[in-house]
Amino acid sequence: MQNIFDEVNSLDKRCRDKFDLSEDIMMENASISMFDYIQNNFEPKTKILIVSGTGNNGADGIALARLLHTLYNVSLYIPFGVKSPMAILQLQRAQKLNIKIIQKIKKYDIVVDCLFGSGLSRDLNKDTISLIKKLNSLQAFKIACDVPSGINTLGQVTTNAFYADFTITMGALKKSLFTDIAKEYVGKIEVANLGIQRKIYETKSKSYLLEKDDLKLPIRDNKIANKGTYGHLSVIIGEKKGAGLLCAEAGFSFGCGLISVVSHELQNIPNSMMQNSTIPLNTSALCIGMGLGKEYDEQLLLNDLPKVIDADLFYDTKILALLDKKNVVLTPHPKEFCSLLKMTQIADISIEELQNNRFEYLQLFCKKYKNIVLLLKGTNVLIGYKKKIYVNILGTSILSKGGSGDVLAGLIGALLAQGYTPIKSAICGSLSHTLAASNYKKNNYSMSPLDLIQEIKKL
């Protein structure tokens, strides 16, 4: 996993103060990183437009133009002039090389957005909005320097933003790149080296980007095991029976030794599963909430089993009694999380407000309920525990179907049953869920929850 930071100004200052890396040195390395990407991916003489703003992000772009000059057909567009000392200096250098500075945008193969960096904290004016619309309309490969222009420090887009195919962010990953809203704009992300290795540039962080290598599959390596060795997951079946059965199927596909469905009514269940009217005594983890409905036996909640809580329970105040327990994983989608925030008196907010501040509200919840692991579903999944947040950006629109969340609950429940910690269960369950969906080879609109389970078996 990689560190994610709220801001990097303090990291830049640390480099200047501790390692004597001047602003000029770091800027040169930033522009070299962008140059290397272009040189490694595009043929010489490709037509490139660099659009530079008034500050240091614009200065990065002007420095890039200097490096590309003569090797590529590069044009520099500076619509609002230059203001920062570094931008003025870089422009003076570019002018001495007679780099082409244009007044009108034409056709290009590559457009590099260097208008604003990660420090944008205001709304865009009309001229900037119009310019970004123009840039977005160009049929070109689009690269963003640091952060696509229009995305502010909180990862919000108040008017419009530059649609990048590739973002080269400076020094370290920023939280603003990983909001659900930002995902539409950032494309693929690469971190630019600013003159020292990232492990030296960076300090400790409380937010982390999950990667494929962070997935630890429940591989069986015990040669004298039996079915009880790998846990017993019980799934509570409610009014919408299909949801619970999908959860149970997913749990069985992910290494769990025994699966029981708990219901007072006879269910048509696979032969591999057991049915009980009460939670079996040897249960090692519990999944509850999927399709549960309003009428259920409250006694099912009154235990200290590790559990995954989903769906309908986020609208029921009985969930409050579980929030001080250990070994509990909550898996709400945004609407359900808004309900939970209201019930816990943390905030009474709209879904829109939540989506604009997902990190903030997850942190508030985890600060109040320190024993709980909360997985907030979304385009980018956020997993919060104590003071840390883990971000899974590997999800795709393939998962935007009913039943996908039931499968996720079963995966997490299966890992809990096998002895994984709640945070490891949430991380590995989420990664397996998204990676399995990414591996689906047919049309992205056709995957069913059962297809997803089949892909999980292939991981």
Residue ranges and their predicted role:
Residues 94-101, 125, 148-153, 214-219, ...:
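Short gly/ser/thr-rich secondary-structure transition/capping motifs
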